[in-house]
Amino acid sequence: MSAVEGDVADASSLNPQTLGFMCGLEIHQQLATGKLHSRQPGELHDVTIDTVPDEWPRVHRRLRIAKGESGKVDVAAKFEAKRNRSFIYIQSPNSGLIELDDQPPDPHDSEALDIALTISGMLDAHPVPLLQTMRKTVVDGSNTSGFQRTTLVATNGVLNTPTGAVGVDVICLEEDSARKLEAQSTANGEIVIWNLDRLGIPLVEIATAPDVQTPDHAKETALALGTLLRDTRRVRRGLGSIRQDLNVSIACGDRVEIKGCQDLSWIPRIIRLEMARQLHFFRLANELREEIKLPLLPDNRDNTDDIIEEEVRQTVRKLLDKEITDVGKAFDNCDSKMITSTIAKGGVMYAVRLPHLAGRLGTKMPDNEGAQLPRLGRELAGAAKLAGVAGIFHSDELPAYGITEEEVTNVRELLAISDTPSCGFALCCAPDWQAELALESVIERGRLAWHRIRQEVRNVVVKKGAPEDGTTTAMRPLPGGARMYPETDIANLPLAEEEWHRIRSNLPPTRKERQKALLETALGEDQIMQLLDKEIDELFLAGISGELAPGMPALPVKGWATIILDST
């Protein structure tokens, strides 16, 4: 078996170096300007689904899969097309025909472009000579057009951190998405309601190289990037104005993109738990392979033999077929209100066999720090939830949830696995089409148990506005190259050398430089920090130097500081 060491139950003890840890960050920062491709104001309205004004128009849309201009269909788009979802867009006062995709976009907002170039200069990046806007396929409904407009601005920068330099691969200028207000489940599929106030607000996206050395260095890198962005004094502040995505892998796993890392203090924990998850499923894959005498996975993904993996894939496809069985009659006298009410409304109870997975699906158990240990059953449930169902029942956690031992026995009989204790099963109670889609997703994910984890996008599990425990759930496959194609409604924009020289010659001072200027006054450290945090140090310096207004004398240092701090 594998020589990869590490205790999955003690994620903090995992050694990044011996596990072949790789990590990079993607930072998305809102800019304090108008919208990127319309001249609408970039403001957010403080509304919920319950407080949206009745006079705001609503538009109902459904997205359909289509090939991009490359002639290919993106893998994430293929997956999303299986979900029977429709979307309602609420038109806020700062959204118009462009946000509704009923009018071609305007050219880039000049101020947003200037900020993106300024950030590129601060990161010592190399600007591209021709700015070409691209369309990035987005099929979750958060963009009315089905794509996000993004423009590559610069490449090959560097961010200095106390632990070491981190390369910056790309800096892009792109549109933010709409804000989700509510998702409603119906018998015919999910209806998602979006607010268009945020759609089109400029974002600068900064993607680092995989130079992050440890989970703690990831937090340090995010903090350094956030500080640099705030040094521009031209970015938005507050909750949701900056988002950090983490790209994480270990040698025996593969690249996973984790979204929803709002709180920097959680970043190391989230990364360590992902390392533990990848290690767990690598070991499980080899355990399953050994049981049916299949070649084991090598410890490093770089040594993977594609021919062997295809042979394993074909073997497992035959082992876990997609035969779905109606087991509703096993629950004719069920005490579970959830099951009986769903069936009474026309729902079904379907099941699939899970050969060799009995006892390996797992039950909810905490690790040494209270986070849920990785388990296959949770991954299967996550796959099913992407089809829109509330979840599944699997054999390792039954009897429970109002399902009795007798009903479990009846299900095993209907599935013809009564004499096969190593065979598990999964149940789904939902409308017919949804139960089928959910269980097909369960089988697809179950087959992956024999393989190295797939590349995918995952989301931090959040409860009451904060991470539940640092664990994640699957969102969608990691997008492929077919996701991106040229935007034909926006002209290419050449970047003149003199414009780049102007940007480089007028970079804003860093926080340390501003602090140094304030230290030359008679202010105490506390007031200096307050002036910097409130971004009013320039106003303060203008006042004490007599440059606040023509003819105005220099103001007293401490008195002027107190006045402006108290009034902001």
What kind of region is each of these model predictions?
Residues 2-506, 525, 547-552:
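Basic, nucleic-acid-interacting segments
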Residues 565-568:
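Small-residue-rich helix-loop
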Residues 534, 538, 546-563:
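Helix-loop elements that line ligand-binding/catalytic pockets
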Residues 496-499, 507-547:
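Long, charged low-complexity interaction segments
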